[in-house]
């Protein structure tokens, strides 16, 4: 418990100033987190980061996370690069004599999209305004807290025992309820330029998908037979273990709240 608490304190000391500062430093930090998360994901599937598929995947992350405001050429480059990488990875299945399979190629492409899009929206959301990124983090944290408390106090019905045996329906609902505290409080101090009832609906959707993101990452770990995605955060596991909910919440937040 002491190790877990100490890790959380150190992580906050490092991450919070970067998040508040935003800009280039957050973008570079997001890239760092994305590369670590990609390595964790590839390791689950026994694909080495410093291998041809690993390097191609890292290049995909590099391209897919390019700032969207850099120009229209970015989207064109991203599309053409993903097409090229698909052909290269599929060709490598033949060159490796199926030691690298078609499923591995699909896994690499999925990893690029899953990790790259999630962490791209970490700095993209911050660039839209500090209140948006704080909103996302608070929704996820209140959801996790509510799910834990309600699950411990009232949890009787398993939510998805095959994937995550400890999660309950009561915890899931409790997470949704607690997440609503965020818009109710933030609307007092921040103008989201949206009606409160609509923001409450968006919050519920974000809370639901945040919990789904947690389950998806749990599904990865259970499928590959690992307890944690990594060991870079003592007591907490890996980067994916800490950011799994955000992989779903941040892109969805941009679609539902920022871009409407």
From Swiss-Prot:
Topology of this chain in the membrane: Multi-pass membrane protein
GO CC field: plasma membrane
Membrane spanning stretches: 9-29, 46-66, 70-90, 102-122, 130-150, 172-192, 196-216
Gene Ontology MF terms: phosphatidate cytidylyltransferase activity
EC assignment: 2.7.7.41
Pathway: Phospholipid metabolism; CDP-diacylglycerol biosynthesis; CDP-diacylglycerol from sn-glycerol 3-phosphate: step 3/3
Assigned protein family: Belongs to the CDS family.
rRNA processing as UniProt keyword: no
Name of the protein in its database record: Phosphatidate cytidylyltransferase
Keyword terms, alphabetized: Cell membrane, Lipid biosynthesis, Lipid metabolism, Membrane, Nucleotidyltransferase, Phospholipid biosynthesis, Phospholipid metabolism, Transferase, Transmembrane, Transmembrane helix
Record Pfam families: CTP_transf_1
Gene name in the database record: cdsA
Organism of derivation: Staphylococcus saprophyticus subsp. saprophyticus (strain ATCC 15305 / DSM 20229 / NCIMB 8711 / NCTC 7292 / S-41)
Top EC class, one word: transferase
Location in or out of the cell: Cell membrane
PROSITE patterns: CDS
Catalysis: reaction(s): a 1,2-diacyl-sn-glycero-3-phosphate + CTP + H(+) = a CDP-1,2-diacyl-sn-glycerol + diphosphate
Main location: membrane
GO biological process: CDP-diacylglycerol biosynthetic process
